[in-house]
Every structure is written in C-alpha cells, then in structure tokens.
Curated annotation (Swiss-Prot):
Chain's gene name: scpA
Cell cycle found in the keyword field: yes
Secretion signal, residue range per the UniProt entry: none
Protein name, UniProt field: Segregation and condensation protein A
Function per UniProt: Participates in chromosomal partition during cell division. May act via the formation of a condensin-like complex containing Smc and ScpB that pull DNA away from mid-cell into both cell halves.
Native species: Staphylococcus haemolyticus (strain JCSC1435)
Length: 243
C-alpha cells in the first residue's frame, strides 16, 4: 500500500473546491447532501483501489457528515442556542483557501513573467561631476535653470537600472538567407528594401541585414550602394548557386 494525494489534490479543501466548481455549486449556499455524497465517492474509490487515504481526508469526511446530519434534524429538535448555520465555518475556510489559490496562481504567473527580464546595474557617472563656483552661478538665468533641470533628469534616468525584455527570435538568419536566395534565382539583382515592408519588426530587418553580410563574405552575393543612405543593391556573386 502507498499514500497518494487524491487526483493530485492538495488536501480535502482542494478536493471540495474542485467539486464545487465542477458542479457549479453556490459556495455560500452549499447543498451538503449532494456535496457529501460526491466527496465520499472519491474517498471510497481510493479505498477500493487499496490506496492509503490520508487521515485529513477522513477527518473532513466526518465533518461533512456531521454538518449534513445537523441540517437534517427537525426544526423543533435543534438546540435553541444553535443560531449559526452549521456550514458557516466550512464556507469561510473554503473562501479563504480559494483566495489563497488565486493569489498563488497570480504570484506564479508574475514569477514566470519576471524570468524573461534581466536587470542592468546603474552606470557609474561620477567622473562626469563638475564643481561649479558661486561666481559662475550668479550669471544663471531662468533658461539656464531649465536646461540644468533637464540635465539632472537625464542623469537620474541613467542611474536607474535599465530593464530589457528578451524576445525569442522568431525569424532566423537561415530563413533570411533562403529568402535572399529565392529572390536571386528569379532576378539577377534586387534592392535590399524590397525584402520586407516597413511595418515589420526592426528585429526582422536586422536579421535580413546580417544574412546579406554573411552571404557577401562567402561570395554568394555582391552588394552595391551608389551614395550614402541610398538603397543597397544585391547582386549574384561568383559563388551563387542558381540551383
């Protein structure tokens, strides 16, 4: 015999909450008869499979049966001092556990999100400090003060850790190389800017650029540019395989 958690539930409250959500039960008005029956079915199933049911599940089973029996008592047999709903304590614990699960899930998601970020330590800018004498300050006007304020803001921003999100590469250099090769099999030359639209991410533009640099170094293509900032012309190189 061995001990397991029922269907991977983390204790009896987790099992009860699962049943409440599965059968869409109002947590503030629990029908004890049906909920107890569903709960006991889980416990009996484990016993039939000769699985050693943890004692906490059996304690909860006893509590459910007790609450159920109190609700079944005729009204005139109920103790006059018993004013509270016998389900009240159980409902309170279930709500508290439900909140705990929701917060745990939220923290888990935040932890996973944070793992995609790396923090850079502030840059040391102490070497940029400049001592200003009082005589120099006397010549300042409002415009100088505004400029100084903007400079202070910029320096403070540099002292803050810079957080950069690392995005998984979705367009590889290999894909860009194949795209260039396909173009050159149909045309002896073409313009670099025709490879993409300017609505595409900058990462994809950079990937294309790295691809043509690699192809140029290996002699697969030649690249030409008439003037600075003009479009780059991509031409078949001596090692280009037209296939």
């Amino acid at each position: 015999m061995y001990e397991v958690k029922l269907d991977a539930f983390n204790g009896p409250l987790d099992l009860l909450l699962h049943l409440i959500q599965k059968y869409e039960i109002d947590i503030y008005d629990i029908p004890m008869k049906s909920l107890t029956e569903q709960y006991m079915q889980y416990v009996h199933a484990m016993k039939q499979l000769e699985i050693n049911v943890a004692s906490e599940y059996l304690v909860m089973a006893s509590e459910l049966l007790m609450i159920k029996s109190k609700l079944l008592l005729p009204q005139h047999d109920v103790d006059d001092n018993l004013e509270e709903d016998p389900r009240e304590d159980l409902v309170g614990r279930l709500i508290e556990y439900q909140n705990y699960k929701e917060y745990t899930q939220l923290l888990t998601e935040k932890k996973e999100e944070r793992e995609h970020y790396f923090t850079k330590h502030p840059t040391d800018l102490s070497h940029l400090e400049k001592n200003v004498t009082w005589d120099e300050c006397q010549t300042l006007d409002l415009t100088d003060l505004i400029v100084a304020y903007q400079r202070v803001k910029s320096r403070l921003a540099l002292n803050k850790p810079k957080t950069v999100e690392i995005i998984k590469e979705s367009f590889t250099i290999q894909q860009a190389t194949e795209k260039v090769t396909t173009q050159l099999r149909h045309h002896t030359s073409f313009n670099f800017f025709s490879l993409f639209t300017f609505s595409e991410p900058i990462e994809q533009v950079v990937t294309h650029f790295l691809a043509i640099l690699e192809m140029s170094k290996s002699g697969v293509i030649n690249i030409e540019q008439v003037r600075s900032f003009d479009d780059i012309r991509i031409i078949r190189g001596v090692n280009f395989n037209i296939g």
